[in-house]
């Protein structure tokens, strides 16, 4: 097993975690980013989306309080400086997938939201 990568977070990531409606969801979000840094969990790649922007250097992980329901929440992160030479995991945002909200916020935070251009 490799040494865990250092973690860094967007300035508003902690607020995102605190805004999750339950302590269980908050804990799950923090465990997810820890597992990503350890290399024991890997998200699905994101792509460029015409309504959102280019998130192709980011990944997403679906989660919820229980495993027997469709996950309502997403955590968006990226490996820096890139996936091949990763030296750090950056938590971008965490929140509901509803209406692409979490992806719009990720694109905004990275200065890539299409309506902001």
Task: Locate predicted features.
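Arg/Lys-rich, positively charged N-terminal/basic patches that mediate binding to nucleic acids
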Residues: 1-35, 115-117
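Intrinsically disordered, low-complexity, repeat-rich regions
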Residues: 3-4, 8, 41, 108-109
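A residue-level signal for beta-strand positions that form part of recognition/binding surfaces
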Residues: 4-6, 58, 88
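A short acidic, often aromatic-flanked loop/helix-cap motif at beta-alpha or helix-coil junctions
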Residues: 14-17, 52, 99-100
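A short, surface-exposed loop/turn module that caps and links secondary-structure elements
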Residues: 37-67
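Enriched for short, Lys/Arg-rich terminal
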Residues: 63-117
């Amino acid at each position: 097993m490799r040494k865990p990568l250092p973690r860094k977070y967007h300035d508003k990531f902690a607020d995102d975690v605190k805004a999750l409606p339950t302590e269980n969801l908050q804990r799950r979000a923090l465990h997810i980013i820890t597992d990503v840094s350890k290399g024991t969990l890997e998200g699905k790649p994101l792509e460029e989306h015409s309504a959102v922007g280019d998130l192709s250097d980011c990944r997403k992980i679906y989660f919820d309080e229980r495993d027997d329901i469709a996950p309502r929440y997403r955590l968006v992160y990226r490996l820096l400086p890139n996936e091949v030479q990763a030296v750090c995991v950056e938590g971008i945002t965490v929140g509901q997938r509803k209406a692409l909200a979490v992806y719009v916020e990720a694109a905004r935070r990275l200065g890539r939201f299409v309506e902001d251009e």
